[in-house]
Each structure stands twice: as C-alpha cells, then as structure tokens.
Amino acid sequence: MFNKVTKSFQYGQHTVVLETGEIARQASGAVLVSVDDTVVLATVVAAKKAKPGQTFFPLTVDYIEKTYAAGRIPGGFFKREGKPSEKETLTSRLIDRPLRPLFPEGFYNEVQVVLHTVSVNPEIDPDIPAMIGASAALAISGIPFNGPIGAARVGYVDGQYVLNPTATQLKSSQMDLVVAGTENAVLMVESEAKQLSEDVMLGGVVYGHEQMQAAINAIHDLVRDAGKPDWEWQPEPKNEALIAAVTAAAQEKLVAAYQERQKQARTALLRNVYADVHAALAEQAAAAGQDAPDAVTVDNILFDLEARIVRGQILNGEPRIDGRDTRTVRPIEIRLGVLPRAHGSALFTRGETQALVVATLGTKQDEQIIDALMGEYRDRFMLHYNMPPFATGETGRIGVPKRREIGHGRLAKRALVSLLPAHEDFQYTIRLVSEITESNGSSSMASVCGGSLAMMDAGVPLQDHVAGVAMGLILDDGKFAVLTDILGDEDHLGDMDFKVAGTQNGITALQMDIKIQGITKEIMQVALAQAREGRLHILGKMREALEGSRGELSAFAPRMLTIKINPEKIRDVIGKGGATIRALTEETGTQIDISDDGTIVIASVDEAQAKEAQRRIVELTADVEVGQVYDGSVLRLLDFGAIVQVLPGRDGLLHISEIANYRIANINDVLKVGQQVRVKVIEADDKGRLRLSVKAIGGIEQQQAGGAEPAAQPESQAE
C-alpha cells in the first residue's frame, strides 16, 4: 500500500531521517523529518496553472506548531490552536527567505508550503528540520525549483564552532547563527551574537555552508529514489519587439529621472515616465489597429530597465540614486527626550528614514509570559516595531502587525538583547516601541540605533551603544560594488541585502539575504568590513548625542526597592488569603513582587510610598528578640493582664504582675484597649509565645511620667 522511502544522515551529534511515501500522499510533495524525537511534516502543493492576470509569484509558507507535539493541551476556552505565535511567524519567514529566490522567473503558479511540528524534543528546535523538510518536499515534487537547499544552526563555544547545538549548548554559546543555501551558494543568514568579530561571524557562515552539504546530498538521494517527474513548464517567451519599444520610449527619461536625488520628487518623475510610456505605446497600437500591450507586462519591462540603469551607473563608479558614493552614510540627526512623559525616547533620523523609539520601564508583573511549545517562560525585554503606511507617503491598512513588522522587531531585539544589564543588577522589565515615521530603507537598523539611545535616555545601564547599518551588493560580469546604508530602491534592485548591528567591539546581530549565486567568501568579507566602517561612523554620531546611560531614571519611571527576608516569613507578608499583601499594595499604591527565595521587590512612581511599604514589610517580618524593648499596642484586656502587639502579627502576654512596681487590683485602672505601651520581651518559649514586662523597664508609672527605655527598631535589609 505504501511505497515508503527513507534516507538518513549524521548531522553534528544528531541523526536526521527523511521519510516519504507514507503520509500526505496527495500533496505534490511530502517529507517527514525526524531529529532525535523532534518530528516535522513538510508538505508542498502547487497549482497546475497560474491564475489569469497573475503578475507575481504567490508563495505561501506556513510553519505550524501543534501542542500535542509536546504532550500538552492548548490553553484558553476553546482548547484549540489559534492564531500563529510570534515563533511560528518568524520561522515561516526563516523558511520563506531562502526558498523564494530559487523559483524560476516568470513562474506564477500558486505554491503553498506547510510545515507541521508533530513531535518536539525540547533540546531540538524544529526550525532546522522544517527548513530541510521544506527543501526536500519541493525537490521531490517536480515543481520548477532550483534547489535543493540545506540549513544548519551554528554555535560558538570555547572558541569552536558547534554544528546544530542543543538548547542547553546554546545557553553557553556566543553565537546563534542559522544559515541556508544551495550546494554552491549561501542564500540566507540569521544570527545573534555576543560582540563577535567579522571574521568569526563569516567563519560561522562558511562552516555552516560546508556542513549542510550532508543534508543536500541526502535530499538528492531521496529525489533519485522517490522524486516525481519534473513539470513541463516553460516561461513565457519574451516579447523582444515590445522590450525594444519600451526601451526606446523610456531609456532617456528614466536616466533623467534618476538624476533627481530627493525620493518624493524622483517618485513623481518616475510615475510620469510610466504614464508617458503607456500613453505612447497605446497610441502606436491604435495607429496600427492593434490592442494596447498588457500594462503589467510593460511595467515589468520598465522595472527591469530601471534596474539596469541604476546598477550600471553604480558599477561604473557614478553616484548612487541619492548622490552618495558607495561608502557614505546618509546625514544623521538625533534628538533625545522627545516625549516628556515617556521614560526614555529618541528620534533617530538617517536621511529619509526616521524612527521614534520609546522606552518604558516596568516591573516583574509587566514581563511577557510566553506559552511556547517548549514550555512557558517569561521575557523581560520586548521590542515592538510598527511601520504605518504614512511612513512611505501611502495609504493602507492599520491593525495587527504583519510578518514583516514582527521580523524587523525581532532583528532589532537580537541586536540589543546581549547588551542589557544582568537581571540582578537591573530588575526592570523593558519595552521598546519603534514607530517608523519615515522610511526609505534600513528602518530596522534605525530601530536598533534609536532603541539603544532610548534605553540610555531612560537610564538603562546598557553595556555599550549599539548601532546597525543595512548594506547592499551589486554583482555583474565579475564586477561588484558594496553599498553602505542602502535606500529602499537599492534594496529592490540589488543582489544582496544584509544588515549588521553591533558595538565598537563586535557584531551582535547579522541578517543576510542573497538573491543570486556567485557571491564568494571574499565578497562577503569586503561587505562585512565596509559594514563595520559604517557602523563605527554611526556609533560616533550616537556618542556625540549621548555618551552613555543617564545616571538617573526618569521621574515618571517606577522606583524599585529590594529587600531580603527569611523565606519562612513570606506567609506573614502575604497573609491569610492574600489579605496582608493586598492591603499593603492598596494602601501604599505600590507593586510588590515576592520570590520564593525571600527577595521582595517594591515598585512605585512615588519613592516615599515605596519606602513606606518597605518599612511595613520589615515590621511584618522582623524577629522579636528576647531582651529588646518594643512600642506595643494593647489588643485586649484579661483579668490577669493584657495581650500586647509588639510587631505586626506578633503579640505576647503582659501579666498584671509585670505592669507596675505596685500591686494592681483592676487591670482597667491602668490599661485600655488601643493604648500604646512600651514593653520588654522577657521570655519566648519554643512555640514562639512571648512574655512581656513593663516593670522591667521602670513600670507603667514611669512611662506615664514620661520616661522609659527607647524601643528597638526593626532592621531593614534593603539591598
């Protein structure tokens, strides 16, 4: 019934198994990938024909995590998986990026790649198995695809590269790098690092590409034994006559339009050129008694012509679109403290790209709780990236963040996270929001720069400034040019887009997308060196604006006090049913977080209120010492004495014989409920019961006369 084909290969310390022919047989291609109990089902389906009028390649990649994979039932009312998590969205993008450039130009059939994580070992992230599975499913499907690709994760531990490190190994790794590519070329890199050099980062890319050949070879073996026949697909033949007509009508006008250095003016000129060409071609067709050429086809020819013009100018050493040479960073303007009530803010402008980045400090209660497949965890650092349509002078939908926004936010977060102070040194939760108010390329790197400045403006003690720069590459006939700080148009027209972020000491994040083959290690080396030059220039500008973190937090940020108590006293602070802690937070207006080890963090915008809460907690948890004198309050009267509270929650017996130096006939003659009285603890039994005395410090008559031994003060253990 089943024609099952299995291939396996060793991949670092893991064995990878590829299976096809048993599950999802009606898909164009389906492969089950297993790596040490992490199992991903990769499926591919492609439409046999493109939709009429289709003008772009409709590829969809969906990575889906099933909670049963971890032996769990989904939370929530419906107990069913819902909208994609951030992890699922980011992994979908990770898989999409190296696959998309490998489909042939002109192939507009709809293709859907779906990856289901159906079993998970917490030590093995499913993203690499999913990438390998997607590649294998496409390779055996017969769909036009210039693959397969391989993928690898690379760590860097004790000066050595580690292939596909486990989750435990990654905790001690200085690098978390994912690389994907074909046999001959790297196509995609995504990484974060702890201030590593360009050589170490590039070495990780090369190492990962070398090691992934094992995966590529296994996929070739799978195709040989289980591959379907290749589709009989040919691209539409080019209309050379139309290309010549468009070129003749538009070449000079496009060259002239690209002499305009200002984006909006240039865009207006280009729109006019497009309109003029369409009108001229329609007029020619009408004169010949023919229909006007397809508008989309003409637009595609014009775009290709634009690309040839811009790329040719740059490779010939002419100025770039905005007049710069290949190494110059656009003018930078920085303004700090832009928003008066925000905890920290920075307006970072680089040419026609601008980010308003805002830092907000919160408490442990503000941490993001993430219900991940691997288990629940908390995140104290969040970075949210928003790019509204007005940033590019357009109208559009505003609502749920799109995949691009989530991806850009994660890249900026990767760049900054390793520079954050240790949690024990700075216990605040940090949220950064990057509002892109103008965009003409490199907005994610503007978010990195603005994020570093906003946190320092908020008083977050970052280890160092972090800057990012987006680079581009144009390669043609053996000639190449690396472009520093690319514009949006240069991103679309170039062959490689890579973003590098880091400090003066090294790289903290690297993202690379390569659209063509033939980019060598040497070219990447030149590109990384030029990126370092640009990054150091930007860091210099940032230091001119703000040398380091401000010494004090914003007046509107919560103040935190930390005290340490005996863990056995936690119940005294919480009280029965949480009554004590609830009353304490409500009466002082503070937030109080209690850890199991007895660490208590008190947060309040009003420092005086925080100190009041601290004082009351110290009182609640103070130990009563025999021989110490305390200011007490009479709780109730007995025939033979009184019950006196010496500290919150601690009271003792004041016997009638220990009140005065004379005989008392009636307790009501000397004490009343609520009366303040100074007492000395003269005994505590093994059950914690206290015996008190007033007589031992002079008697009630002395206190009434105004003289008594001073009371003990509970010791604060504030850190």
UniProtKB/Swiss-Prot annotation:
Keywords: Cytoplasm, Magnesium, Metal-binding, Nucleotidyltransferase, RNA-binding, Transferase. GO terms for cellular component: cytosol. GO terms for biological process: mRNA catabolic process; RNA processing. It is found in: Cytoplasm. InterPro entries: ExoRNase_PH_dom1 (IPR001247), ExoRNase_PH_dom2 (IPR015847), ExoRNase_PH_dom2_sf (IPR036345), KH_dom (IPR004087), KH_dom_type_1 (IPR004088), KH_dom_type_1_sf (IPR036612), NA-bd_OB-fold (IPR012340), PNPase (IPR012162). Its EC number is 2.7.7.8. GO terms for molecular function: 3'-5'-RNA exonuclease activity; magnesium ion binding; polyribonucleotide nucleotidyltransferase activity; RNA binding. Residues 558-617 form the KH domain. Transmembrane segments: none annotated. SMART domains: KH, S1. Gene3D superfamilies: GHMP Kinase, N-terminal domain, K Homology domain, type 1, Nucleic acid-binding proteins. Mg(2+) binds at residues 491, 497. It comes from the Bacteria. Its main location: cytoplasm. Residues 627-695 form the S1 motif domain. It holds the Pfam family KH_1. Its cofactor is Mg(2+). It catalyses: RNA(n+1) + phosphate = RNA(n) + a ribonucleoside 5'-diphosphate. Involved in mRNA degradation. Catalyzes the phosphorolysis of single-stranded polyribonucleotides processively in the 3'- to 5'-direction. Belongs to the polyribonucleotide nucleotidyltransferase family. This is Polyribonucleotide nucleotidyltransferase. The gene is pnp.
